[in-house]
C-alpha cells in the first residue's frame, strides 16, 4: 500500500463516501501508549485516531487505548504490538535503537531536518518507503504519529560553560543525541516520562531534556534545574503509530484507508497543538518564572557535539548498511530542501526582526 499517497489518491471525502455498511466487519483493536493518560498533546493523537475511525465506520471499528499506567511497560510498546498483544502502539521510533539501530533516524537526528523538511522527506522523499522496509522485518508498520517541532536542549542544575562541564553529568536524553552526550563524557540514562521529575528531584540525574515549554513547564523541571538551554539534538521529533502488520493486512480495505487517513490527520493536529502550547507557555514562562535562565550552549560545546555526531554517524554507518542508507537519504534530502528553508523561512525571519 502506498501510504504516502493516501490523502492524494483517496482523500478524506472519499473515505467518508465509503463509510460502513450493515454488512461490514466489526473490529475491536487495542492501542498501547508509552505515555501516561494525562500527557497532552501526545495522548491526543491516539484519541483522535480512535474517534475518527469509530465515526467513519459507524462504530464498527473501535480502538481501545491503554496508557502506560495500564500496561506497566512504557518501553514495552514495540514488543506488545509485535507479538499481537496490542494491534497498535503510540511511542517514538528512537526508543527501539537497542532492537534495531535502523529504527532510530525515523524520530529525528541531531543537527538534522526541520519539521517541514522531515515531513516532506517522509511523504515525498522516500522516507516512508525506507521506514516500512525497516519495520517489515519485525512484522510491523510504522506511521508518523505527531511532531513536537524543534525541542529545547534541556534543563540543567548548573550552567554549562565549557565541554568540561559535561564530564560526569548524569542526563536523561534519548536517541542519537544520547549516544553523542555519552561520547562527550555524560552518563546517559533513559527514564520513562512519568518518572522524570522524581528522578531530577532525587538527584538521580543532573539534567534532562523533554520537549519544549508547552510540556516542560507543567512538569515543574524549572523548580530544580533553572538553566534552560536551546536545542540542537531534536529539530523535528516525530512520534510514531506502530501497527501490527498481520492485523493491518487483515483489515477490510476501507478500514485500512480510514485508519491511514486518521493517523495522518491526528499527527498533524498534534504538531500544531504542541506548537500552540509552546508559544503560549513561552510568554507565560518569561513573565511568571523569572528564575529560569534561557541560554545557548557556547561554541566550544557545539564544536565537540558536532565532532562526536560526525564520528558516531561514521561508526554506525560502517556497522549497519541499512542505517547508512537511511542517513544518506536524509542528508541528501536535507541538503536540497535546506536551500529553500534558508530562502523562505530564515530570510523572512531575519528580515522581519531587523
Task: Please provide the spans of the model-predicted regions.
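Short, low-complexity disordered leader/linker segments with a strong preference
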Residues: 1-28, 348-354
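N-terminal secretory/targeting leader peptides
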Residues: 23-118, 128-354
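Core domains of carbohydrate- and sulfate-ester-processing enzymes
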Residues: 123-127
Amino acid at each position: 500500500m502506498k501510504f504516502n499517497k493516501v490523502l492524494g489518491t483517496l482523500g478524506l471525502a472519499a473515505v467518508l463516501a465509503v463509510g460502513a455498511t450493515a454488512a461490514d466487519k466489526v473490529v475491536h483493536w487495542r492501542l498501547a501508549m508509552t505515555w501516561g493518560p494525562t500527557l497532552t498533546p501526545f495522548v491526543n493523537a491516539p484519541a483522535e485516531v480512535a474517534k475518527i475511525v469509530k465515526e467513519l465506520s459507524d462504530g464498527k471499528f473501535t480502538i481501545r487505548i491503554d496508557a502506560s499506567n495500564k500496561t506497566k511497560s512504557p518501553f514495552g510498546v514495540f514488543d506488545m504490538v509485535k507479538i499481537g498483544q496490542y494491534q497498535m502502539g503510540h511511542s517514538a521510533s528512537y526508543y527501539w535503537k537497542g532492537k534495531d539501530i535502523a529504527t532510530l533516524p525515523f524520530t529525528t537526528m541531531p543537527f538534522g531536518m526541520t519539521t517541514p523538511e522531515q515531513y516532506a522527506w517522509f511523504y515525498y522523499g522516500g522516507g516512508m518507503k525506507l521506514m516500512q522496509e525497516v519495520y517489515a522485518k519485525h512484522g510491523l508498520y510504522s506511521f508518523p504519529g505527531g511532531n513536537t517541532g524543534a525541542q529545547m536542549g534541556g534543563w540543567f542544575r548548573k550552567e554549562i560553560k565549557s565541554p568540561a562541564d559535561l564530564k560526569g553529568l548524569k542526563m536523561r536524553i534519548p536517541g542519537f543525541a544520547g549516544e553523542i552526550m555519552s561520547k562527550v563524557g555524560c552518563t546517559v540514562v533513559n527514564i520513562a516520562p512519568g518518572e522524570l521529575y522524581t528522578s531530577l528531584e532525587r538527584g538521580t540525574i543532573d539534567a534532562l531534556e523533554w520537549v519544549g515549554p508547552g510540556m516542560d513547564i507543567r512538569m515543574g523541571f524549572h523548580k530544580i534545574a533553572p538553566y534552560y538551554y536551546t536545542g540542537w539534538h531534536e529539530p523535528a521529533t516525530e512520534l510514531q503509530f506502530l501497527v501490527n502488520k498481520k492485523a493491518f493486512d487483515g483489515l477490510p480495505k476501507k478500514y485500512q484507508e480510514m485508519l491511514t487517513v486518521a493517523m495522518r490527520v491526528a499527527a498533524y493536529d498534534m504538531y500544531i497543538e504542541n506548537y500552540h502550547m509552546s508559544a503560549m507557555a513561552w510568554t507565560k514562562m518569561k513573565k511568571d518564572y523569572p528564575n529560569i535562565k534561557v541560554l545557548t550552549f557556547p561554541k566550544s560545546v557545539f564544536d565537540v557535539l558536532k565532532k562526536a555526531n560526525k564520528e558516531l554517524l561514521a561508526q554506525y554507518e560502517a556497522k549497519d548498511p541499512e542505517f547508512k542508507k537511511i542517513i544518506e537519504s536524509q542528508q541528501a534530502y536535507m541538503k536540497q530542501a535546506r536551500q529553500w528553508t534558508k530562502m523562505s523561512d530564515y530570510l523572512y525571519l531575519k528580515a522581519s526582526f531587523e
